[in-house]
């Protein structure tokens, strides 16, 4: 299959992956209205074309939390990334490292912190959930610090798991799910050989290191599901802010008042996000939520954004709406599933190329030049 655009990787991933895995990353909550609007609202935003601006010295570089990024992009935390390619977190981290951007390891990664961090040169970011088992949280934070993690991404929009109906249809969950997954793996021999056989162990590395005695991936997913904490409040985050001395980013902000609370809390950054449309269907797309949040807190902390970003043009649109940096989630997993580390590296090259074209034709020589005046319309 020819890959000529960043969006080509989705079809390539669908061909390679068993349906239960493809639809797990591709799907969203309930009827998936927010999932769809994340993409459509962003792609509907019109950029303002400018000409004859001497764009010969264009640069994508930016600064974030004391780091120089080759472009204002980081790879988002995505659970089970190691099921999409053999030791997938390591492959994705290496690709990000080679292109000069951060990689964020998920709490529910297949590869543990101690396997991923030594595989790359630049400091890694780590994502953590609020769980009932505070001992696990402290253990994860201590291990992250020991591994040289610089930035903590704290996900707060998952006090309960979202209802993802597509998973029951695809075989990720529901009746006879294990048998259905085995049948799907048999009909996808490349994945079965590369990941199903040689990608073991298939557990959640960060959790198995803490719990020990693994009894299978489903056991860990069950433990995680029972540990999400609906009683979470800002007060529950105070001990983490005291413990974690590096940059701390609150992920899952969709309302300006919550963004202001993050400033008062002392967060270094926020991620404007609806969890890729995977939690509460019917909420605002990130593109629609971002402008008001940026107006409320820009300059008080760093603003990151995710959900719906598929191309370099989308990156420029998010920056124009008020983001300092964006996180890529599904887009990099599609590329990883299709072509491994090389696929993620190529995706990032395509994103950078698309950004350069968009910036050249909107008259923005530097990332700081991208703003609301780069747009004809807001979402």
UniProtKB/Swiss-Prot annotation:
GO-annotated cellular components = plasma membrane
Q: Which PROSITE patterns match?
A: FMN_HYDROXY_ACID_DH_1, FMN_HYDROXY_ACID_DH_2
Q: How does it sit in the membrane?
A: Peripheral membrane protein
Q: Which top class of enzyme applies to this chain?
A: oxidoreductase
MF terms (GO), sorted A to Z: FMN binding; L-lactate dehydrogenase activity
Domain of life from the UniProt record: Bacteria
Enzyme Commission identifier(s): 1.1.-.-
Q: Where does the FMN hydroxy acid dehydrogenase domain start and stop, copy by copy?
A: 1-379
What is the protein name stated in its UniProt record?
L-lactate dehydrogenase
Q: Which organism is it from?
A: Stenotrophomonas maltophilia (strain K279a)
Q: Which gene encodes it?
A: lldD
């Amino acid at each position: 299959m020819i890959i000529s655009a960043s969006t080509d990787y989705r079809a390539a991933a669908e061909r390679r992956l068993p349906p239960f895995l493809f639809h797990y990353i591709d799907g969203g909550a309930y009827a998936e209205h927010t999932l769809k609007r994340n993409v459509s609202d962003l792609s509907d935003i019109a950029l303002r074309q400018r000409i004859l601006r001497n764009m010969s010295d264009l640069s994508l570089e930016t600064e974030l939390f004391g780091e120089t990024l080759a472009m204002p992009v980081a790879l988002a935390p995505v659970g089970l990334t190691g099921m999409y390619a053999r030791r997938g977190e390591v492959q994705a981290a290496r690709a990000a490292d080679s292109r000069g951007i951060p990689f964020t390891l998920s709490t529910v990664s297949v590869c543990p912190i101690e396997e991923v961090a030594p595989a790359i040169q630049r400091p890694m970011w780590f994502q953590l959930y609020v769980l009932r088992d505070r001992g696990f949280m402290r253990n994860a934070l201590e291990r992250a610090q020991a591994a040289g993690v610089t930035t903590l991404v704290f996900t707060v929009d998952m006090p309960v798991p979202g209802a993802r109906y597509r998973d029951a249809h695809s075989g990720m969950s529901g009746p006879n799910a294990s048998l259905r997954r085995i049948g799907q793996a048999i009909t996808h021999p490349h994945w079965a050989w590369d990941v199903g056989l040689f990608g073991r162990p298939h557990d959640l590395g960060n959790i198995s290191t803490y719990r020990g005695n693994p009894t299978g991936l489903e056991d860990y997913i069950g433990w995680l599901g029972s540990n999400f904490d609906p009683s979470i409040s800002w007060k529950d985050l105070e001990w983490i802010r005291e413990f974690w001395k590096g940059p701390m980013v609150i992920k899952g902000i969709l309302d300006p008042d919550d963004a202001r609370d993050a400033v008062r809390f002392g967060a270094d950054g926020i991620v404007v996000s609806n969890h890729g449309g995977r939690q509460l269907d019917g909420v605002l797309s990130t593109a629609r939520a971002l402008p008001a949040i940026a107006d409320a807190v820009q300059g008080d902390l760093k603003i990151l954004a995710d959900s719906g970003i598929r191309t370099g043009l989308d990156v420029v649109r998010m920056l124009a709406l008020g983001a300092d940096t964006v996180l890529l989630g599904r887009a990099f997993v599609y590329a990883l599933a299709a072509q491994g580390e090389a696929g993620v590296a190529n995706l990032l090259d395509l994103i950078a190329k698309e950004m350069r074209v968009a910036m050249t034709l909107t008259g923005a020589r530097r990332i700081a030049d991208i703003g609301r005046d780069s747009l004809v319309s807001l979402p």
